[in-house]
Structures are given as C-alpha cells and as structure tokens.
C-alpha cells in the first residue's frame, strides 16, 4: 500500500521551485537538491528568480554528457564529433515546467487522494463506455489496487492507469488505462506508461505487466512494449487477473537496466554508438560529390552503375536493383487491411478474434479440419500470404462456415457468424473491382 508520505516523496517539488538549482536524478526518480550547489545557485540567480524554472539540465548517460533545454524540450549531446538532437514530447516539457505531475494514489481515505481517484473514475467511465460504471468505480476505489494519475496543477486529473500488483508473483495487472479525450495528442499516454514502469520497478519486485486490451488499445500497448506473445507461465497468472470477453491478453517484460523515462535519450546514444561501429567496417558515411555526367541535361549519356564511386563498395548488384523495382505487395493489400480491421472492430467479431481454445472446446478440431480466425488472417496478411483477394475471401468464408458447422442454428455463435458475414459481404461490395467476387 502506498502511503501519503511515500507519494509526497515521489513528487518533491523543491527542485523545480528554484530556477538555478541543478537537478540530480536518483534511481527512484526523486529529484534531490544538493545543499552546497543550492546555496551557490541562489546567490548567483537572484536576477532570474521570476523565471519560475531553470533553463538547462545536464546529466551523463552512457558516458556522454546530455544537455536538455527544459523550456524548449530539446535534448542535445555530442558523440564522436557528431551532434545528435531530439525533441521531447509536450507532456515531458509540461512536467519539467511544473505544469503537470504524475502521482501514485490509492484509497487511503485522505481527502486529496480520494479527489484524484474520483477524477480517474470519471475519465475511465467516459473513455470506456462499454464497461459498467459501477464495476469501474469498485475497482478504482478497491484498496488492493493502485493508480498513477496525470495531474494538471493544482488538482485536475487528465488521465491515468489503475493496476493491481501481485508482488509475490512478480507481475501486475493493468486494469484501466485512459487519457481524457481532450488531452490525447500531447504524449501523455506514453509518458504515463514510462513513469509507471520506473515507479513499479523501483518500489517492488514486479517484472511484468499483463493486461486485456480491446482492439482500439492494442496499437497503443504495442508501442509501449507489450506483445500478444505471453511468456509467463499460466500457473503464475491464471485465475488472478480479470478475463474480458473480446479482449486480447498482452504482456510487457520490463528490462532491469533501463530507466524508461530516459529511453529516448538511451536509444539516441545507441544509434550514435551503432553508427560509429558501422564506420569501422563500411564507407557508407562518406559523402561523395555528384556525378559529372548529369551536369549537362541536354547531353545525358548512359553510365555503368559499377563505375559510380561507392556503389560497388556498398554491395550493390544489378539483381538487387531488379528486386527493388518489384512491388512488395499487391494493390489488393490495402483493401484487405481495411476490411480486416473493420471486421476485428465489429461488435459480432469477438468469438472469431483468436483460434478456438482446444482446452475449452476439446472436440472442436475433431469436426473442423481447416480452422481459421481473424488473428491468423492478420498474421497471414502481415506475412504477405494473400497473393490475391480471392485468398482472403476464402479464409473469411472459413471463419463463418466453420462456426455454423460446429454450432447449432439457435446458438448466439451461429447468429454472430451470420451478422459478421453480412457485414463482410457489404464491405467487399463497396470496392468496385472486387464486388463481383461476392455472390
């Protein structure tokens, strides 16, 4: 359980109130002021006290000095004489400016924490309309759950994550995750997840996150390092987390040596180190002058590619050029992708999203010899297995026909198959060049 005292320690504001105090990053993400430095800086910074924040932050990552322009949110560092820069998300800039904070709260009956939890409850209820409101309220206020909230000062909740830790089993279940609809373009979601990962690792022995994601959230969780491949043994989590119909179980394995709030800087440093290594075995970094043959546009003559400086050294061959000219995917791929996405998002699609579980339906594969589901179709599409639209339609028909073959006419599954097939047929008919494929 997180106490009010612990929460306050995790969000000390002292380092941001003095404009010239250099911040020292600690492992638990608490910012501490060095006494000697603070006293010196106070004397030197009297003419800047009205700025309300320091301008630059310097830290060392991987042996390189990284300088952050806090006001503009631009990170710079030099590696092997090359300057690298990247721009922080607006949410990071706002946090550095003291406009927002990330606070961990639970139901400890303190007035302020209860206000934050109520704000989170309201956002979850609005952003997750398919969830019963009473169910959301019960879990948010449940004392076995913790929440990390994004708070715009002084006390406006703009989003957050509610999770349940299972410390002895070394994983936590993310129950709800949402950002207010008016705040979803500022990078709060990614920054919030990074804060949560660092907080959980530094305050517990949790190494994994599990969550059930609906079709609209899968993309977000993939970007945050989650995968549909569950490596945790079922005996660890089965029966402990909530199972949602139509949801996709996803897992995130946290890396022990990474500070996720610095992930952007670390990746940039890795890129710089990789470029240095490439320069030792390749000449791809050398910039060569343009070809003289193209200076006179009225007298352009054919040229042997092998005589172009650097091209042969790069490993180019005529066969590679022919391969590059060949289209990687057919013109039907975009249409298939759109139809498949709409199928997956349809209200009647939930029984067909994943393969039928043999443990739950032991005799299914005795009757169905050519099983198919929407996730398998997605994998085939990503692997470029659909050479023509007819192949995709064939698999879709398998999904519907298999369902009707195994289930009786009066079952809900049979009716779901009919509904989804009708929707599928209409979508294909909307595309003129493929409408003739539907009877």
From Swiss-Prot:
Keyword annotations from UniProtKB, A to Z: Activator, Acyltransferase, Bromodomain, Chromatin regulator, Cytoplasm, Nucleus, Transcription, Transcription regulation, Transferase
Subcellular localization(s) per the UniProt record: Nucleus; Cytoplasm
Domain N-acetyltransferase: 100-255
Family recorded in the similarity comment: Belongs to the acetyltransferase family. GCN5 subfamily.
Assembly notes: Component of the 1.8 MDa SAGA (Spt-Ada-Gcn5 acetyltransferase) complex, which is composed of 19 subunits TRA1, SPT7, TAF5, NGG1/ADA3, SGF73, SPT20/ADA5, SPT8, TAF12, TAF6, HFI1/ADA1, UBP8, GCN5, ADA2, SPT3, SGF29, TAF10, TAF9, SGF11 and SUS1.
Domain notes: The bromodomain mediates acetyl-lysine binding in histones.
Organism: Saccharomyces cerevisiae (strain ATCC 204508 / S288c) (Baker's yeast)
Domain of life: Eukaryota
Role played: Histone acetyltransferase that acetylates histone H2B to form H2BK11ac and H2BK16ac, histone H3 to form H3K9ac, H3K14ac, H3K18ac, H3K23ac, H3K27ac and H3K36ac, with a lower preference histone H4 to form H4K8ac and H4K16ac, and contributes to H2A.Z acetylation. Acetylation of histones gives a specific tag for epigenetic transcription activation and elongation. Operates in concert with certain DNA-binding transcriptional activators such as GCN4 or HAP2/3/4. Its acetyltransferase activity seems to be dependent on the association in different multisubunit complexes.
Organism placement in taxonomy: Eukaryota, Fungi, Dikarya, Ascomycota, Saccharomycotina
Enzyme class: transferase
GO biological process, one term: regulation of transcription by RNA polymerase II
Enzyme active site: 173 (proton donor/acceptor)
EC number(s) given by UniProt: 2.3.1.48, 2.3.1.-
Binding residue positions for acetyl-CoA: 177-179, 184-190, 216-219
Ranges for region Disordered: 1-59
Site positions per UniProt: Important for catalytic activity: 173
GO molecular function: histone acetyltransferase activity; histone crotonyltransferase activity; histone H3 acetyltransferase activity; histone reader activity; lysine-acetylated histone binding; protein-lysine-acetyltransferase activity; transcription coregulator activity
Disruption outcome: Sensitive to amino acid starvation. Increased sensitivity to genotoxic agent generated DNA damage.
Other known facts: Present with 1180 molecules/cell in log phase SD medium.
Name assigned to this protein: Histone acetyltransferase GCN5
Compositional bias per record (Basic and acidic residues), positions renumbered to this chain: 1-28, 39-59
